[in-house]
Each structure stands twice: as C-alpha cells, then as structure tokens.
From Swiss-Prot:
Top-level taxonomy: Bacteria, Pseudomonadati, Campylobacterota, Epsilonproteobacteria, Campylobacterales
Compartments where located: Cell inner membrane
GO cellular component, one term: plasma membrane
Keywords carried by this UniProt record: Cell inner membrane, Cell membrane, Lipid biosynthesis, Lipid metabolism, Membrane, Phospholipid biosynthesis, Phospholipid metabolism, Transferase, Transmembrane, Transmembrane helix
Name the UniProt record assigns to this protein: Glycerol-3-phosphate acyltransferase
Protein species of origin: Sulfurimonas denitrificans (strain ATCC 33889 / DSM 1251) (Thiomicrospira denitrificans (strain ATCC 33889 / DSM 1251))
C-alpha cells in the first residue's frame, strides 16, 4: 500500500474519483425530480439533462444543463490545478487528464457506467492544449448552430482537436490525446449507430 503515499498516485486517485462525480444525475434528481439515467439517452451529461428536464420545465432545463456542463468541465481541471501548482511533471498532468475522463465515463458510483466524457474532456484539454481546444470549440459551435445534433457536433470537434494537436504540437507525445479521443468515440457508438439510421435526436 506504499503507493498510496506517492504524490502522483494520490493525484491519479483524486482525478478518477472526482471525475466520477455524476453532477448531471445529482442536479436533475435534486432540482427536477427526474432520473436522467432512465430517461432520454440514459447519459448523465448536460445534453441529456437538458433534453429530459426540458419536457417538464424548459427554463429549469437550461439552468441545470449549463450547471452540469460547467461542473463536468471543471472537475478534471480542479485536480490539474492543484497538481500543476504542486509541481508535478507534464506526464503526470496528462495521466490526471485521462483518469478524470475515465472517471466520468466509468464512474464507480454508478456501477462503472457514466457519461460520454465530452465536457470533462473539454475541461482537461483546455488546460493542457488551450489553442487546440479553442479550435475544437469553434468547430463544435458551428456544428451546433448548423447541424443541431449534439453528438455529431461533439465528434466533429473531437476530430478537429486531435488533428490540431498533431499540427500545432507535432513533437509531443500524443498517446493521452488519442486515449481520451478513443474513450469519447467508444462512448458515442450508440449515437453513431443512430446517426447512420437517421434516428439521432436534435437538441435545440
């Protein structure tokens, strides 16, 4: 158990456990009285919170969706900030980033189920690769405006971020970016299937 006293290990554990907090599920249950895991797409993320709560309270849906998006984005950044000011290596920061996303997508509080990782991934990437993330957010915003399908906008933005990271930082180790990208892509497989079938719902 000596590894638990290792600083890096402590940050890794914190990143996973904090990343695993299902803010969307908690907020929707407390303030709207709905279980997003058994409604809509079953995801705990901001999009499903907005979609499910909107059916009964559109004004509240926007507030809870925004709060979920913000909290999911910040939960990985919080640990990164502590670790950064503690002086850990860049490799450790990337490890924290990956584990925060894994925590959100495979939460031990939810039987290792979870969300799709978009907001949490966006948060850690904004910290680690800010310019690439800004490019991805612009792509996402354009997709949201013209396509109006959340999953397709997110996947397009993910692709833009990965490509931008190779162009702007060709010499960096891209393994963490690829891992996060793969996890997000894997979690979106049901959405991709619905896209091909023309069944994916739009979120306005």
């Amino acid at each position: 158990m000596d590894f638990l006293f290792n600083t890096n290990a402590q940050f890794f554990i914190a990143a996973y456990l904090i990343g695993a907090i299902p803010f969307g599920l908690l907020l929707a249950k407390k303030y709207a009285g709905v279980d997003v895991k058994s409604s809509g797409s079953g995801s705990i993320g901001a999009t499903n919170v907005l979609r499910v709560v909107k059916q009964s309270n559109p004004a509240l849906a926007k507030k809870l969706g925004a709060a979920t998006l913000l909290l999911d984005a910040l939960k990985g950044v919080l640990v990164l900030l502590f670790a950064y000011f503690y002086g850990v290596s860049e490799a450790t920061l990337w490890g924290i980033s990956v584990l925060a996303v894994l925590g959100h997508c495979y939460s031990p509080y939810l039987g290792f189920e979870g969300g799709k990782g978009v907001a949490t991934g966006m948060g850690v990437m904004m910290f680690m690769l800010p310019l690439e993330t800004i490019i991805a957010l612009v792509v996402w915003a354009l997709g949201a405006k013209f396509i109006r399908i959340s999953s397709l906008s997110s996947l397009t933005a993910l692709g833009a971020l990965i490509v931008a990271s190779f162009i702007l930082h060709p010499d960096m180790a891209h393994a963490p970016v690829i891992i996060i990208g793969f996890v997000l892509l894997y979690k979106h497989i049901p959405n991709i299937i619905r896209l091909f079938k023309g069944e994916e719902k739009r979120v306005v």
